[in-house]
A protein has these predicted regions:
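Class II aminoacyl-tRNA synthetase-like tRNA-binding/catalytic domains
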Residues: 2-120, 128-132
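Generic recognition of stable, solvent-exposed alpha-helical segments in well-folded globular domains
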Residues: 18-25, 29, 138-145, 279, ...
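A generic secondary-structure signal for well-formed alpha-helical elements
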Residues: 34-41, 150-161, 310
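N-terminal pre-domains immediately preceding structured catalytic cores
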Residues: 50-57, 168-179, 321
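Extracellular structured ligand-interaction cores
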Residues: 101-103, 124-128, 204-206, 246-248
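Extended, charged alpha-beta segments that form solvent-exposed binding/catalytic grooves
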Residues: 105-191
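A translation/RNA-centric and nucleic-acid-associated enzymatic feature enriched
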Residues: 110, 180-336
Length: 336
């Protein structure tokens, strides 16, 4: 079990039944906001995929995927998704979406190697979204514009929740602060990446840390990223300061996706050249898929943040270590 944060004197502001009502309101409101702001159309999404397609998310490349075999397909092995990062781009190409339009899904995933704590669960639920762009829009400026659109939707959600549930009032900044991972390392060279995130997010309350995945001048990465969906020069994480837990709290990871050149370069840098033979990777390398931008926005993360919950298990049902359940109960945190 990872380190558990137990806020002193914690008491949930909403009881379980009211929490469930609030969760529905948050999800209904935000998905409409984000669909309108980014011009997205809702689509159904897979729970599992064929590993031979290369469509599953490899995350940091070391996490084991949940898999099983299908009796009626000669025991063919399939994998439960870890995210839909690559699947969404494939769908945009398959259905010939035009620049400026895209999709969002309710993504449900299982990550069996997740280290469980207040904000990490084996079960992951998020709005996974993807939008077609032009080659000319593969710029930092376009990335920032998209981050601002998402942040405005989050700000509108904050105002909505404050009206609906004043007992869990949240005040977030009018604007999000942008900084690159290298600028952050230059500011705090003696600190580890997570410590840097803590300081910058505590100061600015809402931050987009960009350019994640490649090596910094120190020779270390800010954080790991799979080499086959985000362009490491055009991606980042949206972080909010969570004052219930006293931590930098990630609500979204997103980026402009790799073109053929970035895919080629990053596969080699990551030592993943074996993926070049997978269907998805061949399509990107051969310029057969549209340019796109996309990401994931945590559903339970947003609910947890705006309802001022101390544990993600207060807003979704999962399996937790017995000692975690017991310790949470003793400190006023009731896991569903």
């Amino acid at each position: 079990m990872s380190k558990l944060i137990l806020p002193a004197g914690y008491s949930a502001q909403l009881e379980p039944v009211e929490t469930q009502r609030a969760i529905k309101k948050i999800k209904d409101y935000f998905q409409d906001e984000i669909a309108y702001g980014l011009q997205l159309r809702r689509t159904t999404a897979p729970l599992f995929v064929d590993p031979d397609t290369g469509l599953n998310d490899n995350l940091n490349g070391v996490e084991r995927r949940v898999d099983f075999t299908l009796k009626d397909m000669n025991e063919k092995r399939v994998e439960v998704v870890q995210s839909l990062a690559k699947w969404k781009r494939y769908v945009l190409g398959k259905y010939n979406f035009k620049p400026g339009r895209g999709i969002y899904t309710d993504m449900n995933a299982l990550r069996r190697d997740e280290e469980l704590d207040n904000i990490h669960s084996v079960y992951v639920d998020q709005w996974d979204w993807e939008k077609v762009i032009t080659k000319e829009q593969r710029t930092t400026e376009y990335l920032h514009d998209t981050v601002t659109t998402i942040y405005n939707a989050v700000k509108n959600l904050s105002d909505y929740v404050n009206r609906q549930f004043p007992e869990v009032r949240n005040d977030i900044p009018n604007e999000i602060f942008f900084i690159t991972s290298q600028e952050l390392e230059d500011m705090y060279p003696a600190l580890e990446p997570r410590e840097r995130e803590q300081l910058i997010t505590c100061e600015h309350k809402a931050v987009f840390i960009e350019k994640i995945g490649g090596l910094l001048r120190s020779g270390k990465k800010h954080d790991g990223r799979s080499p086959d969906y985000d362009d490491w020069e055009l991606n980042g994480d949206i972080l909010h300061w969570n004052d219930v837990l006293g931590i930098a709290f990630e609500i979204s990871s997103m980026g402009i996706r790799v073109d053929a050149e970035a895919m080629d370069r990053q596969l080699t840098l990551a030592g993943c050249d074996d993926r070049r033979e997978l269907e998805f990777h061949k399509m990107v390398l051969n310029d057969e898929l549209p340019y796109s931008i996309g990401g994931g926005i945590g559903q339970s993360r947003l609910c947890m943040y705006f309802l001022r919950k101390a544990h993600i298990g207060e807003v979704h049902v999962a399996v937790w270590p017995e000692d975690m359940v017991k310790e949470c109960h003793e400190h006023g945190i009731e896991l569903l």
